[in-house]
C-alpha cells in the first residue's frame, strides 16, 4: 500500500480500525502521523488484549517500527471527523457499531458513495465468525444492525475476501448459514471447504448447540 499510494502521489489523511484484532490495527511508519480512529470499545479491548495482540504480530513485524497499537484515538461520535476522507467537504463517514465479531466492531458507511467497509463481516471467503465462546446472539444482532446499510449499499468491501456489487447476497448467505446451524440442520455453505473454516464451523455448531440447550433448559 505504501508503494502503491506513493506511485500515485496519494497522501494518507486518516485511518479507521474496525476492531481490536492485530491484522486490522496495522500501521506503516511511512503513512505518517495521520489521525487513526477506532471505537471506544475497541480501544478498551486493545488495552485488555494488548499482550496477546503484540505476540500475534510475529517475527515478520520489524522490531524497529513503532507499535501499530500506539496512537489510536477513540471516536467521540458515530462518525469519522475530518480530516479523514479528502473526497469532499462534509462527506459523511458513519460508523455502524456492533459486537458481532469482536466487542466494539464497527463497519464504515460512506453513504454518498454507496460504499460499505464491513471489517470482518460479510465475507465470501470466511464463515460468520462470532466472538467465541458465547456471543452468537451478538452476531445475529450485528447482522440486523447492518441490514439497513447493506440494503442501501452499491458496493460492499469486506476485510477478508472480495468486494461485491451484490451486498445483499452476502447478508443473505450469512443469515441462511446461521439459521441452519441454529436449527441443527446441516449447513450447505461452500465456505466450509475453505482453509480454516472447518474448525470455525465446528466452533459455531458448538455455540449454537449451547444456545439451544440453554434456551430449552
Mark where each language-model region is:
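Short, acidic/turn-prone active-site loops that include or flank metal/cofactor-
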Residues: 40-44, 122, 183
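Metallo-beta-lactamase
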Residues: 7, 43-99, 103-174
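Accessory terminal helices/loops
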Residues: 148-155, 162-217
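Alpha-helix C-terminal capping segments
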Residues: 5, 27-32, 89, 110, ...
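Active-site metal-binding motif and surrounding structural segment of the metallo-beta-lactamase
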Residues: 1-41
